[in-house]
Amino acid sequence: MATKKAGGSSSNGRDSIGKRLGVKKFGSERVIPGDIIVRQRGTKFHPGRNVGMGSDHTIFAMKSGSVSFSVGLRGRRFVHVV
């Protein structure tokens, strides 16, 4: 019988993988319908003109054009395709 308990491994040493969130198309970049503009958790950016929002809050283009960002009331950031 062992007189000393076996040394356990550390409970640290792991991390979750990155989720590749963020802005994918920046201001004045050209987009076509269906292009993803922003991947996000929650509504950091809100959909504006010619832009839709998916169930996971992904912002995507609904028409062809160039991307523009604006700040609305109460500091809300909007994404538009014009």
Curated annotation (Swiss-Prot):
Give Gene Ontology CC terms. ribonucleoprotein complex; ribosome
Q: Which SUPFAM superfamilies match?
A: Ribosomal L27 protein-like
| Family matches, as Pfam families | Ribosomal_L27
Q: Name one GO biological process term.
A: translation
Top-level taxon in the UniProt lineage: Bacteria
Provide the GO MF annotations for this entry. structural constituent of ribosome
Annotated region (Disordered) at 1-20
Q: Which InterPro entries match?
A: Ribosomal_bL27, Ribosomal_bL27_CS
Question: Which keywords does this Swiss-Prot/TrEMBL entry list?
Answer: Ribonucleoprotein, Ribosomal protein
The record's family statement is: Belongs to the bacterial ribosomal protein bL27 family.
Q: Which PANTHER family match?
A: LARGE RIBOSOMAL SUBUNIT PROTEIN BL27M, RIBOSOMAL PROTEIN L27
Full protein name: Large ribosomal subunit protein bL27
Q: Which organism is it from?
A: Neorickettsia sennetsu (strain ATCC VR-367 / Miyayama)
Lineage of source species? Bacteria, Pseudomonadati, Pseudomonadota, Alphaproteobacteria, Rickettsiales
